[in-house]
Amino acid sequence: MLINGVIIMEMDKRKIKILQAIIHDYIQTAEPVGSRTIAKKYDLGVSSATIRNEMSDLEDMGYLEQLHSSSGRKPSDKGYRLYVDKLMNIQKLSSMEECAIKTHIINSALYEIEKVVREASAILADLTKLTTVVMSPSSIESYIKSIQLIGLDANTVLLVLVIDTGIIKNNVIKLHAKMTIDELVKINRILNIKLNKIRVESINLDFLKVVLEEFKDYEKWLKDILPVLYETLLSGIDSNEIYLEGATNIFNYPEYNDIQRAKDFLSLIDDKDKVKNLIKSDDNITIKIGKENFIEDAKDCTIITAVYKLKDRPLGTIGVIGPTRMPYSRVVSILSTLVDELDKLLKDDNI
């Protein structure tokens, strides 16, 4: 059978419709689905007995699971994978939901990027009713956008570094020699001429020694300023922070009525290293279902992530973690819309 341009050799049209109906029903109800339910609720034009036989075949093919011989069936990881890859139609958001996302992103435009993506994670948790996770940008592949030294008194300046990703770093520098306003202005100009648009990873001690040699007249101040600038620049340079929102949203899902399962989930998301490894991605939208997650603790979860970018350069990841029974179509639609708006904001250089 040809679906979305892809031939599914082992499936006929009737099996596809029955599988779609079962997945749709199970996502909505969280109850194993029987043949009588499908026959009553979905106009498939076949009897309950025929549906039962087809469901048995789908189970043999690995698309469905049956917990008990007397119970209905539910989708397997393989069934969900076929659904999201070939059968799912992306749900269109309401105009109110689209407006809420756009307004939320626009209102966060005055913040630095780390705050913006955390705000995006909060609206994602609110709309999806799932636990959301965001990985903040690393500075290592970024460049310095501006350097500002602000005089606090004759022997003290505040260093403010702005990275092109929107990250802002600051530090207070104590000077051994007093500095006038004119000297402060000149040193600000020197630092911005020499370091502006330079990649962070290119700035090392040798580079700063060259700057010191080139501007000997200002050495008595630069020898205090440059080491602190270097230290400030390197602090957390290659660390992607992980932020979570909506951890208690899992209790909206009956899967987590099981106390042990809920504890396991909360333990998983509390392990930032595990979460970081789980959500790393280079793709626009990535969906990992159940056993596709290589970490054992996440093998009954689905993780849907998207990469947000600065002028087409990947910065970090944002996504959701929840049970394999989740409203995939709606979540993908919300996440896609959110990341599109986030990318527009960053591309417009508003941060």
Swiss-Prot record:
Sorted alphabetically, the Gene Ontology BP terms of this entry are:
negative regulation of DNA-templated transcription
Task: Name the keywords, alphabetized.
Answer: Repressor, Stress response, Transcription, Transcription regulation
Q: Which domain of life is it from?
A: Bacteria
Q: Where is the signal peptide?
A: none
Keyword Repressor listed: yes
Q: List S-S links within the chain.
A: none
Q: Which GO terms describe its molecular function?
A: DNA binding
One Pfam match, given by its short name, reads HrcA
Task: Briefly state the protein's biological role.
Answer: Negative regulator of class I heat shock genes (grpE-dnaK-dnaJ and groELS operons). Prevents heat-shock induction of these operons.
PANTHER family referenced in this protein's UniProt entry, alphabetically: HEAT-INDUCIBLE TRANSCRIPTION REPRESSOR HRCA (PTHR34824:SF1)
Similarity field: Belongs to the HrcA family.
State the protein's name.
Heat-inducible transcription repressor HrcA
Organism, scientific name: Clostridium tetani (strain Massachusetts / E88)
Primary gene name: hrcA
